[in-house]
Swiss-Prot record:
It is found in: Nucleus. One of its GO terms (molecular function) is DNA binding. Its main location: nucleus. Component of the RNA polymerase I (Pol I) complex consisting of at least 13 subunits. The lineage of its organism: Eukaryota, Viridiplantae, Streptophyta, Embryophyta, Tracheophyta. The gene is NRPA1. Zn(2+) 1 binds at C79, C82, C89, H92. This is DNA-directed RNA polymerase I subunit 1.
Amino acid sequence: MAHAQTTEVCLSFHRSLLFPMGASQVVESVRFSFMTEQDVRKHSFLKVTSPILHDNVGNPFPGGLYDLKLGPKDDKQACNSCGQLKLACPGHCGHIELVFPIYHPLLFNLLFNFLQRACFFCHHFMAKPEDVERAVSQLKLIIKGDIVSAKQLESNTPTKSKSSDESCESVVTTDSSEECEDSDVEDQRWTSLQFAEVTAVLKNFMRLSSKSCSRCKGINPKLEKPMFGWVRMRAMKDSDVGANVIRGLKLKKSTSSVENPDGFDDSGIDALSEVEDGDKETREKSTEVAAEFEEHNSKRDLLPSEVRNILKHLWQNEHEFCSFIGDLWQSGSEKIDYSMFFLESVLVPPTKFRPPTTGGDSVMEHPQTVGLNKVIESNNILGNACTNKLDQSKVIFRWRNLQESVNVLFDSKTATVQSQRDSSGICQLLEKKEGLFRQKMMGKRVNHACRSVISPDPYIAVNDIGIPPCFALKLTYPERVTPWNVEKLREAIINGPDIHPGATHYSDKSSTMKLPSTEKARRAIARKLLSSRGATTELGKTCDINFEGKTVHRHMRDGDIVLVNRQPTLHKPSLMAHKVRVLKGEKTLRLHYANCSTYNADFDGDEMNVHFPQDEISRAEAYNIVNANNQYARPSNGEPLRALIQDHIVSSVLLTKRDTFLDKDHFNQLLFSSGVTDMVLSTFSGRSGKKVMVSASDAELLTVTPAILKPVPLWTGKQVITAVLNQITKGHPPFTVEKATKLPVDFFKCRSREVKPNSGDLTKKKEIDESWKQNLNEDKLHIRKNEFVCGVIDKAQFADYGLVHTVHELYGSNAAGNLLSVFSRLFTVFLQTHGFTCGVDDLIILKDMDEERTKQLQECENVGERVLRKTFGIDVDVQIDPQDMRSRIERILYEDGESALASLDRSIVNYLNQCSSKGVMNDLLSDGLLKTPGRNCISLMTISGAKGSKVNFQQISSHLGQQDLEGKRVPRMVSGKTLPCFHPWDWSPRAGGFISDRFLSGLRPQEYYFHCMAGREGLVDTAVKTSRSGYLQRCLMKNLESLKVNYDCTVRDADGSIIQFQYGEDGVDVHRSSFIEKFKELTINQDMVLQKCSEDMLSGASSYISDLPISLKKGAEKFVEAMPMNERIASKFVRQEELLKLVKSKFFASLAQPGEPVGVLAAQSVGEPSTQMTLNTFHLAGRGEMNVTLGIPRLQEILMTAAANIKTPIMTCPLLKGKTKEDANDITDRLRKITVADIIKSMELSVVPYTVYENEVCSIHKLKINLYKPEHYPKHTDITEEDWEETMRAVFLRKLEDAIETHMKMLHRIRGIHNDVTGPIAGNETDNDDSVSGKQNEDDGDDDGEGTEVDDLGSDAQKQKKQETDEMDYEENSEDETNEPSSISGVEDPEMDSENEDTEVSKEDTPEPQEESMEPQKEVKGVKNVKEQSKKKRRKFVRAKSDRHIFVKGEGEKFEVHFKFATDDPHILLAQIAQQTAQKVYIQNSGKIERCTVANCGDPQVIYHGDNPKERREISNDEKKASPALHASGVDFPALWEFQDKLDVRYLYSNSIHDMLNIFGVEAARETIIREINHVFKSYGISVSIRHLNLIADYMTFSGGYRPMSRMGGIAESTSPFCRMTFETATKFIVQAATYGEKDTLETPSARICLGLPALSGTGCFDLMQRVEL
């Protein structure tokens, strides 16, 4: 960036061990600062003066922007500065010397802030001296590391006494002296907490504002910005000027402002103010005083030269504070003073960095060249104006033009002309996704990569990838020549670039050459490989370790390792290392099925990327760490991620079911085809280039004894698996697995059905069924000591704690990978011989069952009418006209609105679910099929988990069921129809989207349309949620990327801040956490578990973690106590100590390794599952009385924005033990908000069209309201007739008058009548405010529509608005927020204008407008305060001029009011306005609690652990459901504290994290974060490890508050400027870094990637030292 530089780049030297020409210098740190005028001149090779680019012949014009001193423009030209051609010339800078100094555009906001707080008379800060001293002391203390003392200094507010001032000064002096004496400050490591506190001190100080100076008492003129980058003084009041004159203060305007802008003498422009002797001032002539008054009665420009002198004196007088600007950490580097705020020359970048774009015959100049040209033109015009001595106003006008030109050059968004706004300034080159940081430094184009479509291959190993020859010929690896590989490399050179395996290039110390095309020349090169010194044939003994540095770039070949990636790369397993298999004749990448779930890939045209590592360190990490076999467990929860799918599952069930027998040939063929004999070898075996691996192993295969010996030997399918397991675990103890299968116990009972299919003896049939349940025992897999005893291998055996998972846990990732590879080939070959097919007969239902199905679905058609009759209280036997029913529906919708519609929908759906899932429907797919499940192929696929689910089977054979759209039934049009073919308000299930048809027999057009609507919703969700979840994950990643496990087992940030003392509170790695609490599995496989652990591990893996966690220890003890004695003796665990030793060994083997990037894993583990969430932002809690925000919007609230005012705040609290549901109802009634609408029984309106009232012809509207009697009110409220009567007269009538007047104004505007309304009325100010905010929202069209009122939009408009917002890229969603200041942000923009400080309130702090209430917010019981408040309202009731009521009467349950309207007034719907008003006026209001319902402790949002919270005992679900609880919408803790005699307030909980933080503290807020994120994921059936959530919550509450994961939160507090810049608003953060003189020590991954260095995590967190023996 122009005029920003990095200085003091620290370098360290080391010798590369890998390459002879390796890097010898590495950047260690980067410091940011602004370039001084001397720096610009030092870098410049040319003073650019001419705006002309080319002469008449087209050559570069001397002194122009294409001058050859700046570098050649064309390839054939030579540089006039270095003499090199374009390719070799690095480019040279020039500069434009400005006639007058101007403001630095990037620092203008900060400069303006300084000017507002500086006194123009005494040149000090206008703040009190003690405030300045306190700020300086605080900064010094924080930099020293004593944040506590700095906080105490802030809290000790100074008093007016002299002694306190002296003590404050002494504290300041002492601290300062201590600070100066501390010599280690420069070498300190600054933390994010220090940085946050320092910036907070500066921000708070710059917020201090005063009308007059606290030192000289002078009243300074107010400043304004007529345009960005220009300052103007406002006219002063006569009283202020007079006060200054009396005090002897005078603002002196220099007449030589333009003629001598750089003069520093007292007679020049710097003599803006001077404090003269008081006696002399009193003797001034009255004419001078009058001139002073006249001068300050008008505005005038404050020129940059004047401002520079103001700042010069300010820096001299307030040197101690100002020294922190430019060198925040007081590191003693070269300090930059006030001159950084001004530009005297502009640096011109070299020509090669702003090349013109050619398209055909036209040439388009680079935007920077255009901007620089404009600056030169403006500068020359200004210089000519000074030379010609034009008027001062004209010179100033041209000076402003120069300032504007430089502003546009730096940031085009400051331009006033739209055409200039669309161009790119320097800031635009840095910002956003296409900017310099993210496009060029964080993300770079890669070489040695390929991309193609993937296709499946079940024969290759699961960690192999098939590469087509066209890629293998192009991708090469630079292999160093050694005595061990020289023969292979010779062959490669001889083969050349066109024959595989060959080579393309050969290089030595001097050069790199492409291999010649002739074989003879290549043979000559091959013979020279080891022809000179250092060659020897004796293995391992050489004369010279460096054999001339020869390297051969050979082709990719079998056994090489490559990185394979499928985008989007949402989590760690999206990029894995695979071994190469070059497959001849192929054109696509070949991938095994087991990798599909890891990459989330399918084979319908997906493409994947392959990257070929180019050095040995990368290859070593790829083979041992990133290898696909090692990515077996899901990082988010530790569950298995790699498994066989679809046909392999079908084949495994068919092979391992009980009646599968194989002869010797078939048995041996299956074993041999599986390739299991080669799995024991550690090296690759097979012939190169073959699609099928040919066994080259001499290892013997141990077979098993056949299950049947006579008449012929027969083996079962289970014995094939036994033989495979024996081979896989060869050399290790055998293992045991017990795991339930997905197949039910009666799945294979087909024969019992076929014995007597028409038997009527139900008793006999039941006995047969029971015998099958006892004898089959195929519903549970049992492998004992490698012997497959019973059960089948289905989907469950590839899931958690299944067969493969157990092998992975006991024998390692390679064994599990080998097992999957063997199973894949085995099941593929078996299915080829066995066969598998599906037909229509698999789908057909038995005739009698089909008739019952049809009958039951016909009963469902009457559900709608039954629900309506129940709702309206109509007896079943009573006949009712359909038209009458429709009228009733419309009436209830008119009265209750959408809530009535939703309630009816829920009732119908509940009834339909009961009706369609009972009786024959339950057993239809198990007992009702023509082909029984054991022989039914569709059943086999769905039940075993191979393909599809029971729902798919049901849709094919039974019915499609209810179609849901956003969790609701099919929506209705305005006419009340769901489709034009149905009647209005047709509540039959079919009209609401219930489809009784099935795919087998076809769908009717209406059903087909409904089904398409439901399918479309899924597509829309997928398209929209991608950007939202993507931006959420990016926010998490950038905040958490630096967190890693250290060697002391703590989790620390890049600055050394401790986030957790033990990762996840127990130190266990999520990948290894699966079996740590599975005590039974550990005991039955104890031999293998103990074999993996050494004695050192048992004694403690680390001195920091030496014992088991308490919860794990207690769990193991309980397990031993529950074991019968015979099992204890059999498992050798008679005492607890033996089991604890086993668990301890497993625990220490499962600890997270130092260097583990746990922050990245946590970010990915939360971000990746969020893509599975739908966009249903509101899910119904309990019975649907309350909405709860879920999904991505809720995660954004919790993590990204840390919103103080969330969309759906709730509170929950259980009742005390012994309290009943009646007590809960009592509380809900007292907390319930009761509006006037709730007590209105009916409303009548009559109109007298023409009458005379007070000698005026008018119309009278008579509104009569009938109210319910008090006995109809809620049971436990104390509302009386007096209460509602006073409310109706005092509040309701006032609100109704205001609503009528507002409505009349709107109708007048619609009719085009602009009548002046006399006098403002109560409640109309908000309308004016709304109109203003509406205009602001129109101006800010890119703000996601946050300010738009929902009520003003129709449903279609709202939907369109949402769609417009959703289509935005998630990057745009982030960087253009409304609460951000202008695009060129100084250090602290929000406090830019002192005028705005008093009125500026953040969104979070703005109180929401409260509805009118007749009682205090916090009053929840009693009537006394209600009456007092209502009387107070009545006393305040003043009749406005515009009021229209002429008669009011309220007696008993009746209230009547008459309104007078002029004959020319438009007609209004008064009844509708009255109904809307009645819903806004409260008779009883319990503060912020909107609604309260009775729930139970089984609600996931309710916390309940029994009578004693400290015990945290486990409570059964039934016991929880029996305990009543409250569920309130809104957060008001004091309101519930009032009922602590009935509520167990120890369990009081809210989902509002800010409220929990403010009331209960930071630990409660941390727990709330964990609970809320967990609740969101559990609602979608997603499991995320609690360790990730613990880390996220600890990070967000690390500083003692609740900070968001956005650029305002954790990113803003990062000590790494590169980390901040590469996230968002790069310009803002780079200016901040340069202003403060920040130093980046390159600890964060972002900073290291920017400079091309490996991250300091994983294998990068340590260095290796070579032991050298001299």
